[in-house]
Amino acid sequence: MAGMLREVCGAAASGLRVRFGPSPTGFLHLGGLRTALYNYVFAKQQRGTFVLRVEDTDQGRVVAGAAESIEDMLHWAGIPPDESPRRGGPFGPYQQSLRLDLYRAASEALLDRGAAYRCFCTPQRLELLRKEALRNQQTPRYDNRCRHLTPKEVAEKLAQGLDWVVRFRLERGVEPFQDLVYGWNKHEVAEVEGDPVILKADGFPTYHLANVVDDHHMGISHVLRGTEWLTSTSKHLLLYKAFGWDPPQFGHLPLLLNKDGSKLSKRQGDIFLERFAQEGYLPEALLDMITNCGSGFAEKQMGRTLEELISQFEIGRITTHSALLDLEKLPEFNRMHLTRHIENEGLRQKLIQELQLLVEDVYGDQEVDKEVLEKEYVEQVLLLRKGHISHLKDLVSDNYSYLWVRPSVSREQLQMISAEVDEIGKLVLGLMTKPAAVWTIEELNKDLRSLQKQTRETKYSSMMKLLRLALSGQQHGPSVAEMMVTLGPREVCGRISKVLSS
């Protein structure tokens, strides 16, 4: 067992190495994504390694499938780990429940050095201590009773088969450390806490032991984690000292809060990544939003790509202020990134395929002309609606149903707008049959204004209202000229002719 503690493990890793260590007690949410993202961009900027380590030592709270889902969501977000339970790597296994022998060996080493001791206090005694402290309006803490057991007393209790845990001896006089975000810090943990449990009775470690042992043996050079662990860092540094190991550099990330300053609640259900993926949000939009609301960059800027986040990230610019998240802005972030996807030919091809599937899914039980599923038509829809939609699925909403199925509009509906339905219809049919190399919105707008002048009494706004209803069945939407360009001359003629013959 002692061989498992050889320090060559820590020395074997070279270069910058960071880790994201989620607990699979739930699924990946925006707070976790932000921690993972800062680790990822820091590693990629420095040509380092991004490690995913599943911290599943609290077995009673592990949610089935959560560990796999977390790794899936990192891939979906575009920030996949270089080493992980799924990908493997030179410092595996990357799941703490599979590393129990290592933690037991580490606790034995501390026991041998006198830096830790076995505690035989029962849960009942610990509960009495807690209640007594609360009754006296004090913070509950362990009274370190078993720290003073003699070797003989320990041997007698072991011989009796009593349950025990391993506690770490907290020492006074901790050394200050320089946090990458919060600057110089130290917390005299021995003055406010009892000796902490590092190995439980079931053989599983607590976070304090597991994270120190794993960060050392996995060669982690920088630990970027949530600010809730800042006050525990002095305790972890005492553990490093007891082992005789060099600690990594620490940087604690400020909290991600709701825009009103309240805590993000996992119970809300609306901060989990799977929900955003199912609703059609682009991962780039989420990455952009959670960095835009915080710090780490020279200036706030919407629309950053992952490559830009990597190149522009400055760890020294992370502030201690909490980041306020305004989820109401997410559709705008998504609109910007969706526009960029549409403009990029390679990314646009993927959107075309996704939109074709959406149309078949939403309108498959209706009479859909096969031509509307053709690549050229779908691509034109995307290019013309670029900048006007926040989600791809917007294009299969009721407002855009006219793009995929022919509306049911009667002559009577149009006559309520203008009595010149036949005249206007014939003028438009004549315009559509006129030869033209390319129909453009600008040219059609000019032609439609010219047509209106040929009517007897129909105003331009009324003519547009009539044509919009005839072509789309809608009273609002894109300009009539855009509708006509999108549908094409043949489809426009078909829809106008259908109304005239009804």
From Swiss-Prot:
A motif ('HIGH' region) lies at residues 24-32. It holds the Pfam family Anticodon_2. It catalyses: tRNA(Glx) + L-glutamate + ATP = L-glutamyl-tRNA(Glx) + AMP + diphosphate; tRNA(Glu) + L-glutamate + ATP = L-glutamyl-tRNA(Glu) + AMP + diphosphate; tRNA(Gln) + L-glutamate + ATP = L-glutamyl-tRNA(Gln) + AMP + diphosphate. ATP binds at residues 29, 228, 263-267. The keyword Metal-binding does not apply. PROSITE patterns: AA_TRNA_LIGASE_I. InterPro entries: aa-tRNA-synth_I_cd-bd, aa-tRNA-synth_I_codon-bd_sub2, aa-tRNA-synth_I_CS, aa_tRNA-synth_I_cd-bd_sf, Glu-tRNA-ligase_bac/mito, Glu/Gln-tRNA-synth, Glu/Gln-tRNA-synth_Ib_cat-dom, GluQ/Sye. A motif ('KMSKS' region) lies at residues 263-267. L-glutamate binds at residues 19-21, 55, 207-211, 225. Residues 1-20 form a transit peptide. GO terms for cellular component: mitochondrial matrix; mitochondrion. Belongs to the class-I aminoacyl-tRNA synthetase family. Glutamate--tRNA ligase type 1 subfamily. HAMAP family: Glu_tRNA_synth_type1. This is Nondiscriminating glutamyl-tRNA synthetase EARS2, mitochondrial. It comes from Gallus gallus.
